[in-house]
Amino acid sequence: MLKLDLKRGSLLCFSGRFLSSNVYLMVVENRAVAVDGGMPWTANLVVDYLNKNRLKLEYIFLTHSHFDHVMGVNRLKKRTKPRVVAHTRSKRGDVKVKDEDVIRVIDNKLSFLVLYTGFHKVDHVWYYESNNQVLFIGDYLPTSTELKTLRERHGAKPKIILPGHGKPAFLQTLSY
């Protein structure tokens, strides 16, 4: 598990073994938001962490509906009944979002801009959390042109890019 301290709260990355996507947990005080659900064995790591630290999971944001990103969602939902956020083209989710929607959670301490990519999977989105300058990209890696467009169109300049698989990228020195 990787843990980073952020401007508002902390960010944890749970990496599962064999076929699982990363599951990210943003924690502010005793409340949490997950990005993707991973496979059940990765979700178990998240649930154990939530239980040990007495955290309430309020939302699960899905980047897309491939099995390795969603199979752990039911395990995550058992404990605190979080709301599941997904693109309108997804069959999953009870909060439907579209391109350029903004979802504010945990008393507005976290603010997620939804960016529809449509690449990789028809319901694929990125989530840009503006208070911490974090971009969750699922399985679609942005090009430098897309990062430039993101900055020009939305004033967003991510410092951390969090992929569905692999390690985070830190962009403090990248110019785009």
Task: For each feature predicted by the language model, list its residue ranges.
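Short hydrophobic patches on amphipathic alpha-helices
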Residues: 25, 50, 77, 153-154
